[in-house]
Amino acid sequence: MKLLKPTWVNHNGKPIFSVDIHPDGTKFATGGQGQDSGKVVIWNMAPVLKEEDEKNENIPKMLCQMDNHLACVNCVRWSNNGVYLASGGDDKLIMVWKRAAYIGPSTVFGSSSKLTNVEQWRCVSILRSHSGDVMDVAWSPHDAWLASCSVDNTVVIWNAVKFPEILATLKGHSGLVKGLTWDPVGKYIASQADDRSLKVWRTMDWQLETSITKPFDECGGTTHVLRLSWSPDGHYLVSAHAMNNSGPTAQIIERDGWKTNMDFVGHRKAVTVVKFNPKIFKKKQKNGSSTKSSCPYCCCAVGSKDRSLSVWLTCLKRPLVVIHELFDKSIMDISWTLNGLGILVCSMDGSVAFLDFSQDELGDPLSEEEKSNIHQSTYGKSLAIMTEAQLSTTIIENPEMLKYQQRQQQQQAEQKNASIREASGAATTAPKVASMVNGESLEDIRKNLLKKQVETRTADGRRRITPLCIAQLDTGDFSTAFFNSIPISGTLAGSIMSSQNNQQLMSLDSNAANSLNTSKPSAEPTAASIKPTDDAASKDGVNATSVSTAPPASSSSVLTTPSKIEPMKAFDSRFTERSKATSGTAVVTNTNQTVVDRLKDQNLIKDNKPKDILESSSDSEEKIPAAKPLSAPKRKLELEGETVEKKKKGRPRKDSRLVPVTLTVQSPAALASEKDAACISAPALALKLPTPIPQKSFTLQVSSDPSMYLEVENEMTTVGGSKLSRLKCNREGKEWETVLTSRILTAAGSCEIVCVACEKRMLSVFSACGRRLLPPIILNTPISTLHCTGSYIMTLTTAATLSVWDVHKQTVIVRDESLQTILSGSDTTVSQILLTQHGIPVMSMSDGKAYCFNPSLSTWNLVSDKQDSLAQCADFRSSLPSQEAMLCSGPLAVIQGRTSNSGRQAARLFSMPHLVQQETTLAYLENQIAAALMLQSSHEYRHWLLIYARYLVNEGFEYRLRELCKDLLGPVHYSRGSQWESTVMGLRKRELLKELLPVIGQNLFQRLFTEYQEQLDIL
């Protein structure tokens, strides 16, 4: 045995709490305390193994240093394939690192000495769930799961294939959880905590298998960590700090019956870390000895607070070697090399030690094939030797579930083969990939960057060059470092992690190109421009009328209604979602130009440029301040004005100037004083909205059909003493026109109908081809706002009453419903009006609330509240897999577009108990389903229903899941008195159930899957 303490491996005198050797043996990582943050350092293994490499100045010792953790790093662990490095620290975070293929070294940021990062490692995922310090992390044998434990008494199982998805949160410990280890077979995971217990959990259903407490009854919480370990053959689990007759031991727990009859004794203080050698050994055969095969055995290293290290062989009753006073402080972590002959040990004193054994001392290691045969003969097929495509966390009990998984695997294989073919085709055209980036050589890129630097001359003739930051170039791949003197086994390749995107709406000016910001939790945001489609809306799309306020004193105040839709923010933080926008820039002529000129001076009007823009249903960021009222306080109803333009003959310009027009609304009388209000309630006055001022002529662009224009010309001619007004419609080059006997105040249209509101409270309705559908409708009060969607007409009168009709069916949907109910506060305004394609009116208020009117119940229902704590605290990201991230642009998405990221932000900023987060998430998802049902948005209903079901499965809410399945299945046998409806908004419930069943069968609810699958087969 050789012992080495490389002094160059240090954290500048600060403690080192963790060490781990890379699976290929070329490097190792340390984690601990930095100067003012946590520190993760990746070191070269070659100078540790060979003295000549240590003396060679051309071989770097430090490869990379990462100071991203805000507090001390307690654990670092490499994934079994060597692609990822996970680190957990006191900042409650787990960071997952991956090597980046940047060209050239870089200096360590903030370093006083000129430290150089030879390799570049970037954080690809930040895992947030723990509410306390993260003490330990561990990768599963097949790298599909990552487990973390914390002082918050929980163990979190992360889906390593789809970070940051949480598969399970293991609760049961009543003390700080300080250690984790996976069963090498993949059936169990064990955790040890300060509550004097060691718990073993099943990976099949993430439930508790057993809790062992007797060996720990005399233990106290005196150790910083409790790093337990499982033997590579799976037979034994060895704990950290245990007691036997008041003496510190490492308890040996047998897998068969979880018996605790043996332990490792001899240390004078508490055992902090136990680490099994990854190899299984057999006795080395000497020359001339019997060829009889020996019984395999394992090797284990034990570290203690007494600063000593002991190495044990399970075939011996006494330790193979004991090294006393190896460090000045407690041993914190141990890591074996993959060949099983080397061991790295770190201490709280900030140093590490390396022990190099020979095969004569430990024995002959078994090959991986022999090791796998032991696993298969003892336990069946081991998860450690299964590929990800073969990975199955549960035993498949149903052949239908097996067929479904096989179909999924086949589809994934086909997609993979297609991508490989595309990549190979591209590779043939670019043989020099390593030296080319985006079609340019790296040398050309560097030269072009240097040309951009700014050089000036001072008065005395000296040159002054402004520094230019040149970002490092990522070639997309990296080769083996030249200084690695150890052969690397295999190619360490991994797919780039999908970035989690948060979408944020930018400026909403009609002439500015809109963009969505996409950001990763651990990266700076990047912009991605989105082009609108020509489609008016998707299946359940809406036409939106944004509302602004101003006094109607000027004759130039013309009510207009351009329709814009704000894209919904991403449901799942991982993907950029693009929303279909309805283009609807209305154009209206204005006979008085003074208002426009005044607005120009205030920089409130900008020219529309011929660019692709993403329009929004929300208000513009720049608004005209309402004129100060001369009487009682006013309640303002913000209405989206339709844009104004000078009348010109022929087809109007598309690059019209948008003019927001403000309208005042008479508010109820001022409230009585608090003294009088105690006994007298002042009667509320009726709301009063302004009437559109008649204009000589104006032009509108129909929001749902950008190729459709309405031209109005009032009092164009006089016939028989009466003045006639003309309505002209132009759609894709086809025109029709008609005349009316009254002046037209406002107009609206859709793909099916055209509607105009005239003086004398008359409403006229025409077909899309100009045929009058109804005699003039006489309204109770004058019109204030008019809107059309499909065959539906919505009117808002000056008395603040709302009405909706279906022209084709000639039925009333909403009859003179007052807005008094939802305009609760004196400062509340209506910021947006929506009319869905199902005739559901929606009012978005300035206080962040949105209401829709339910014709069946004749009630206003709250469908969205931007201040709702449920929306801010719900966290359902783990329930949405990456391949199912979908675009949702229905009415609910439009209403909630501004706040879709609030829950994600709150989850990062504020910690809460997991049980409370479960309850808030369930309540939020159920509210979303109910709101989508109220808005008759079928695709949004299906979207949220799938998310809800997946969340129930992930969290194990069987009773709610069963209730959901029962409602979708309905009665198995026909009953004449049954009230069950087989469809919901045109969606067949049993078809929805078929979509949910594969999600249910992926977890511990296979029997529930079988139960409902059989009933569906019968039906």
From Swiss-Prot:
Region named Disordered: 406-433, 513-561, 599-633
Chief location: nucleus
One GO location term (cellular component): HIR complex
Top-level division of the source organism's lineage: Eukaryota
User: What segments bear the compositional bias annotation Basic and acidic residues?
Assistant: 599-625
Q: What is the effect of changing L993A?
A: Abrogates interaction with HDAC2 and impairs transcriptional repression
Bias (Low complexity) ranges: 406-415, 544-561
| UniProt region (Interaction with HDAC2), positions on chain | 960-1019
Per UniProt, which keywords does this protein have? Answer: Chromatin regulator, Nucleus, Repeat, Repressor, Transcription, Transcription regulation, WD repeat
Q: Give the region (Interaction with RBBP4) as residue ranges.
A: 23-443
Q: Which SUPFAM superfamilies match?
A: WD40 repeat-like (SSF50978)
Known CDD domains for this protein? WD40
Where is it localised? Nucleus
Gene3D superfamilies from the UniProt entry: YVTN repeat-like/Quinoprotein amine dehydrogenase
WD repeat residues: 11-53, 68-107, 129-168, 172-211, 220-263, 266-322, 326-367
Annotated region (Interaction with HDAC1) at 444-1019
Keyword Transcription assigned: yes
What exactly does this protein do?
Cooperates with ASF1A to promote replication-independent chromatin assembly. May regulate the transcription of a variety of genes controlling cell growth.
- Fetch the PANTHER family from UniProt: MEMBER OF THE HIR1 FAMILY OF WD-REPEAT PROTEINS (PTHR13831), PROTEIN HIRA (PTHR13831:SF0)
User: Family, per the entry?
Assistant: Belongs to the WD repeat HIR1 family.
Whom does it interact with, and what assembly results?
A: Interacts with ASF1, HDAC1, HDAC2 and RBBP4.
Q: What is this protein called?
A: Protein HIRA
Look up and give the organism this protein is from.
Gallus gallus (Chicken)
The coding gene here is HIRA
